[in-house]
A protein has these predicted regions:
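Acidic/histidine-enriched, beta-strand-rich ligand/metal-binding domains
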Residues: 24-119
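Sec/Tat signal peptide C-region and signal peptidase I cleavage site
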Residues: 18-22
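Bacterial N-terminal signal peptides
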Residues: 6-16
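Positively charged n-region of N-terminal signal peptides that target proteins for export
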Residues: 1-4
């Protein structure tokens, strides 16, 4: 009976310390994306770019511009690293990643969203 009483006393603590839920963000034109497989970096400098999250295995970028998240597909790690280290992240983003309309080099309308992130 002592073991059962000990377990019952500990049960609320075990439940309270359950697994942490991964952060999920709402990506414009796509929907919710779990960031559990991403490496994210907050951008501390004055920029419209405020967060950069990258899943290197899937070559998938989620970026926050002001308060809105956008996504980019089939983007290589070198381009993301250059974005992270760029003196002006907004200028680098505009020139090398975004594009205009559907002609962006990593636009998810012309490059497939990784299967694990499809809705």
């Amino acid at each position: 009976m002592g073991r059962i009483a000990s377990f019952l006393a500990m049960a609320p603590l075990l439940l309270a310390c359950g697994p942490a839920l991964a952060e999920t963000v709402l990506v414009k034109y796509h929907g919710p994306v779990s960031l559990d497989a991403f490496v994210c970096a907050e951008v501390k400098e004055a920029s419209d770019v405020s967060r950069i999250c990258y899943d290197s295995a899937e070559r998938y970028l989620v970026i926050r511009l002001r308060s809105t998240y956008y996504h980019y597909c089939e983007i290589d790690a070198g381009t993301v690293q250059s974005l992270r280290t760029a003196e002006s992240k907004r200028q680098y983003f505009e020139a090398r990643i975004k594009g205009s309309g559907k002609d962006g080099p990593f636009d998810c309308r012309t490059h497939p969203v990784p299967k694990k992130y499809r809705l």
